[in-house]
């Protein structure tokens, strides 16, 4: 979801949550800043062993349709603007790269030799890197969930499945572009012969079946803030996997991750422009939504990940990603700071009392997150060995 950021990995013992933050970020003291009237009800993720037809991990007590109905008119009025300012960030299909551009050609006489070369390049890649790349791929493969999520948003959803509104065109075309990411990473990992594809496929099926709980409440203010954050997070994550692939000697894989990161950057630009427009026409509503989302903390899209074995799979995968510097708590703070600056939140004028409180909260949050991350990093915690089914139950330090 490009090869820009280069972060130092956090201490392997630094535990993370589904929001990508150190557990210390969830301290009680953080709650004193709650001021928004649109705060959602906290949801819990719990294992479900009672009903076989229910997803193994559920998101409970969800709030819906929190945006006042009159604000739907804002998004209807932005149809023309979106056509000129958002759809321009899509690429025509004929100008897009396709997964086959980076994979051995099965129609070629040299196909087997190309596969052998790929396996030779990847045989020394560390298991930790493979786990993170698999987790990234699984996240990309849960694309049906993300299109579903976008189509829950009031005022911008695709009402027919083939609507010609700018918002609907964007959602379908964005989904189509993103679809290439999981396809490419899936096939590449399959060809390495180093991962358990059946366990990976089960994880993907479990994840799509479980859905996701971004706590966007059918509210496009919250939804587009979430996607702005997530597209930048995936840009950073894929950029860092590209850098590490190069360090491990697989320049083809580095190119694969880099080209995906470039897509994510382009998509980030589109989503951040939407939120920037909301700050322009409704600064109070936009800053309240931003504060609300940050108080709830931005959950990663795959936070309900499960492989049929590990109830803490997402947390363990995230811990490894943090160890090797692919996505860290520092990145979370950097993303927030980037968006606050991009949307000029500090310079907002004419806000309500609640709006001023929200402004103060979000403008001061990134430094607080960094301090909490540094504190968590300094704490020595026991390291445990955890088996990952994706790599044939090999154990990694978490």
From Swiss-Prot:
EC number from the UniProt entry: 1.14.19.2
Positions of Fe cation 1 binding: 140, 178, 181, 264
Residue ranges, annotated region (Disordered): 46-66
Primary residence: plastid
Cofactor binding remark: Binds 2 Fe(2+) ions per subunit.
Cofactor dependence: Fe(2+)
Chain residues that bind Fe cation 2: 178, 231, 264, 267
InterPro entries, per the entry: FADS-2_CS, Fatty_acid_desaturase-2, Ferritin-like_SF, RNR-like
Subunit structure, as described in the record: Homodimer.
Domain of life: Eukaryota
CDD domains membership: Acyl_ACP_Desat
Function: Converts stearoyl-ACP to oleoyl-ACP by introduction of a cis double bond between carbons 9 and 10 of the acyl chain.
Pathway: Lipid metabolism; fatty acid metabolism
Family affiliation: Belongs to the fatty acid desaturase type 2 family.
MF terms in GO: metal ion binding; stearoyl-[ACP] desaturase activity
Enzyme class: oxidoreductase
Location relative to the cell: Plastid, Chloroplast; Plastid
GO biological process: fatty acid biosynthetic process
Catalytic activity line of the entry: octadecanoyl-[ACP] + 2 reduced [2Fe-2S]-[ferredoxin] + O2 + 2 H(+) = (9Z)-octadecenoyl-[ACP] + 2 oxidized [2Fe-2S]-[ferredoxin] + 2 H2O
A Pfam family matched in the record: FA_desaturase_2
Descriptive protein name: Stearoyl-[acyl-carrier-protein] 9-desaturase, chloroplastic
């Amino acid at each position: 979801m490009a090869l820009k950021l280069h972060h130092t990995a956090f201490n392997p013992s630094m535990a993370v949550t589904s929001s990508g933050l150190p557990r210390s970020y969830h301290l009680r003291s953080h709650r004193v800043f709650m001021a928004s009237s649109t705060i959602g009800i906290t949801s819990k993720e719990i294992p479900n062993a009672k009903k076989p037809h229910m997803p193994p991990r559920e998101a409970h007590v969800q709030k819906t349709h929190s945006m006042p109905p009159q604000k739907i008119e804002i998004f209807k009025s932005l149809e023309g603007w979106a056509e000129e300012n958002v759809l321009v960030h899509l690429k025509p299909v004929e100008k897009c790269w396709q997964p086959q551009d980076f994979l051995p050609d099965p129609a070629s006489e040299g196909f087997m030799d190309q596969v052998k070369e790929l396996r030779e390049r990847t045989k020394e890649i560390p298991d930790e890197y493979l786990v993170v790349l698999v987790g990234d791929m699984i996240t990309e493969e849960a694309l049906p969930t993300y299109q579903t999520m976008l189509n829950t948003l009031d005022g911008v959803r695709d009402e027919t499945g083939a609507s010609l509104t700018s918002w609907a065109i964007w959602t379908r075309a964005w989904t189509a572009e993103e679809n290439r990411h999981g396809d490419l990473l899936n096939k590449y990992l399959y060809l390495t012969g180093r991962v358990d594809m059946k366990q990976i496929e089960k994880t993907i099926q479990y994840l799509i079946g479980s859905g996701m709980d971004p706590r966007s409440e059918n509210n496009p203010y919250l939804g587009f803030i979430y996607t702005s954050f997530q597209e930048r997070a995936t840009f950073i994550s894929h950029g860092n996997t590209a850098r590490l692939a190069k360090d491990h000697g697989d320049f083809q894989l580095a190119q694969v991750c880099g080209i995906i990161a470039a897509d994510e950057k382009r998509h980030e630009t589109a989503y951040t422009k939407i939120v920037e427009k909301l700050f322009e026409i409704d600064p109070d509503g936009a800053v309240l939504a931003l504060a609300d989302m940050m108080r709830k903390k931005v959950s990663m899209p795959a936070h309900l990940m499960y492989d049929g074995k590990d109830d803490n799979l997402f947390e363990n995968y995230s811990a490894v990603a943090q160890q090797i510097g692919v996505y860290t708590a520092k990145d979370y703070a950097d993303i927030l700071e980037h968006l606050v600056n991009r949307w000029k939140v500090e310079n907002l004028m004419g806000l309500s009392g609640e709006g001023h409180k929200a402004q103060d909260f979000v403008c001061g949050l990134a430094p607080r997150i960094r301090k909490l991350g540094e504190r968590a990093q300094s704490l020595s915690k026991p390291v445990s060995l955890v088996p990952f089914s994706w790599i044939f139950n090999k154990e990694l330090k978490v």
